[in-house]
């Protein structure tokens, strides 16, 4: 790719050793082979309960971006980065997404943009992060999810049991 940075794609996207990464949406087949991931990086193609250090979402329709934004944000680590990738105008792929649209949606979600990158000759990306002053407020995302509690067995005593027995007696 003439004219593109010689910086490895994983480094350009901020992927470091040991990171949890989610790659979602219309992922081009050439994307992952070009990543050259550092050691210990775990890649997922669907959102799981744990927080992700880097999420890369490929979209070509505004409706899809709006639909996926909330669940993706809920899984982003407070210090992590969310890359939204859309087709460049030069790619001549139909899309209703632009850099300005992505930025406005990010700002509405409490994020700020801090990096733009050419992912390849078709896709451009904008990195969004949680505002520094808000990271403490969303720090709960970094905690592993609480284990699901088993329902307590029903008992014949306790609050409401006396009323239930009184109502069920024959008159």
Residue ranges of each PLM-predicted region?
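Flexible, glycine-/basic-rich loop-and-beta segments that form/coincide
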Residues: 9, 131-171
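Conserved class I S-adenosyl-L-methionine
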Residues: 13-27
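Short, charged/polar "capping" segments at the starts of alpha-helices
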Residues: 28-34, 92-94
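A short glycine-rich, Lys/Arg-flanked "PGG" loop and its adjoining helix->strand segment in the class I
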Residues: 66-78
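Short beta-alpha junction loops
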Residues: 86-91, 121
């Amino acid at each position: 790719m003439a004219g593109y940075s010689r910086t490895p794609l994983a480094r350009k996207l901020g992927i470091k050793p040991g990171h949890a990464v989610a790659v979602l949406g219309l992922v081009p087949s050439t994307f992952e082979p070009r990543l050259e991931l550092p050691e210990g990086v775990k890649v997922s193609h669907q959102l799981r309960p744990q927080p992700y250090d880097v999420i890369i979402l490929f979209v070509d329709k505004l409706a899809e971006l709006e639909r996926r934004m909330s669940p993706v944000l809920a899984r982003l680590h407070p210090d992590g980065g969310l890359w939204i990738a859309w087709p460049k105008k030069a790619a001549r792929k139909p899309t209703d997404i632009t850099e300005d649209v992505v930025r406005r949606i990010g700002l509405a979600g409490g994020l700020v943009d801090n990096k733009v990158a050419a992912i390849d000759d078709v896709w451009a990306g904008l990195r969004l992060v949680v505002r520094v002053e808000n990271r403490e407020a969303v720090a709960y995302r970094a905690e592993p999810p609480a284990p699901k509690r088993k329902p307590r067995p029903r008992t014949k005593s306790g609050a409401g049991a006396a009323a239930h027995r009184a109502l069920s007696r024959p008159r």
